[in-house]
Curated annotation (Swiss-Prot):
GO terms for biological process: translation. InterPro entries: Ribosomal_bL34 (IPR000271), Ribosomal_bL34_CS (IPR020939). The lineage of its organism: Bacteria, Bacillati, Cyanobacteriota, Cyanophyceae, Synechococcales. It comes from the Bacteria. Belongs to the bacterial ribosomal protein bL34 family. Keywords: Ribonucleoprotein, Ribosomal protein. PROSITE patterns: RIBOSOMAL_L34. Pfam families: Ribosomal_L34 (PF00468). The keyword Ribonucleoprotein applies. This is Large ribosomal subunit protein bL34. One of its GO terms (cellular component) is ribosome. It comes from Synechococcus sp. (strain CC9605).
Length: 45
């Protein structure tokens, strides 16, 4: 049996699509705004 290698890394996930990263750019802020408007429970990763 082979191992499942696509585990996912929390550090990378936060660095790429975390809240603070989103707030840095204009388009990232737009993402947060849209998700707030839709009433998402989680705005960012």
């Amino acid at each position: 049996m082979t191992k499942r290698t696509l585990g996912g890394t929390n550090r990378k996930r936060k660095r790429v699509s975390g809240f603070r990263v989103r707030m840095r750019s204009h388009t990232g802020r737009r993402v947060i705004r849209t998700r707030r408007k839709r009433g998402r429970a989680r705005l960012a990763a």
